[in-house]
Amino acid sequence: MADRSERSGVEILCVGTELLLGNILNGNARWLSEELATLGLPHFRQTVVGDNRDRLIALVQEIAQRSRVLIVTGGLGPTPDDLTTEAIAAAFSVPLEERVDVWSDIQEKARSRGRTPSPETRRQALLPVGAEVLWNPTGTAPGMIWTPVPGFSVLTFPGVPSEMKAMWKATAVPWFRSSGLSKGVFVSRLLHFWGIGESTLAEQVADLLEGVNPTVAPYAGRGEVKLRITACADVSSKAWVLVDQIEQELRQRTGNLCFGVDEDSLASVVLKRLGQTGQTLSVAESCTGGGLGAELTAVPGASSVMLGGVISYSNAVKRDLLSVPEDLLTQHGAVSAQVAEAMALGVRRLTGSDWALSITGIAGPDGGTPEKPVGLVFVGVAGPDGCSTEMLRLGPTRGREWIRIVSAGEVLNRLRLRLMVND
């Protein structure tokens, strides 16, 4: 075993064959990485391993040679393939003991839900001798904080994200703050951009991307680009000043391309602007099939702004519900600027909303023609000052779902820009 002076940093180990095979997205590792950065903790490596006892043991022993702290998620349940606690104990040849307090907690939680704990559940009360319990406030699987050898500690959490996050905030954060591992206070802010590609944005801010403190890192999403600003200082107030300075510079260079920060989405930003002025919104959708309405209504408080929507997939619904003239459909086709305009005006009139959005297009993979290929989309924005339409050529290569998502984002962004002009 390595000397404690040779170890450094924090590692994350995520356990589960479903993660290894890609059946489940590994959101825990991403969330934990951000938490570690916020705490100013050096984080050097992430690993995913399946539900295999021997591989788990070997990995834990390997990590103990090089790192100060190992964070493990997953494998704490009651079934035979939940091997995390057993494997970690075996890695250091330490026996497991049943913790009476843990078993009592498991039984009490089962009774409060009108259940009787199964015999298998008792396995969750087994912890290595000397380990400290990490109590699970919402589930039955406890975690642990354990220092099996000097200079190396293990923290285990359930794989269920909500349980893991609650336990992390309640117990792990205080432990890390008192551990002496922090290299300062790290803070970060995420800026969201629409209407510019990742490479183009990177060129505009190339000098800022080379900075050391703060750092600026780009991330590409589906239609949007994100820049994360991260700064470190001895106290958070100083770190935030550094972040604010870089954010101001980024906004000056990019203008209205930046639409939000942190948890903002185009939908939430648009709804907030409309709500502040007491205005309402409705939508008419064809190729997005309700995706635009779903994005809007996913935002808490959307009901104060969002009046309703129409999924007008067929020409008959466009004509009968939205009053799209038959001659427009015949002359220009359902996928056209003229029909997008009529859809937006129609749903605005139907619902009595202040603003209305429309989308009509060809999401593919079939249905395209040389004149109107897959990825051709028209969007409309109707408001008190009239209706505008835009043609989008999104192309077929990225697939149907990408076309649908980007179409919804494009029309929301156009409404955002219209609202900025009207402010």
UniProtKB/Swiss-Prot annotation:
Cross-referenced Pfam families: CinA, CinA_KH, MoCF_biosynth
Tree of life domain: Bacteria
InterPro entries per record: CinA, CinA-like_C, CinA_C, CinA_KH, Competence-induced_CinA, MoaB/Mog-like_dom_sf, MoaB/Mog_dom
CDD domains (UniProt xref): cinA
Coiled coil, from the record: none
Family (UniProt): Belongs to the CinA family.
Stated name of the protein: CinA-like protein
Organism: Synechococcus sp. (strain CC9311)
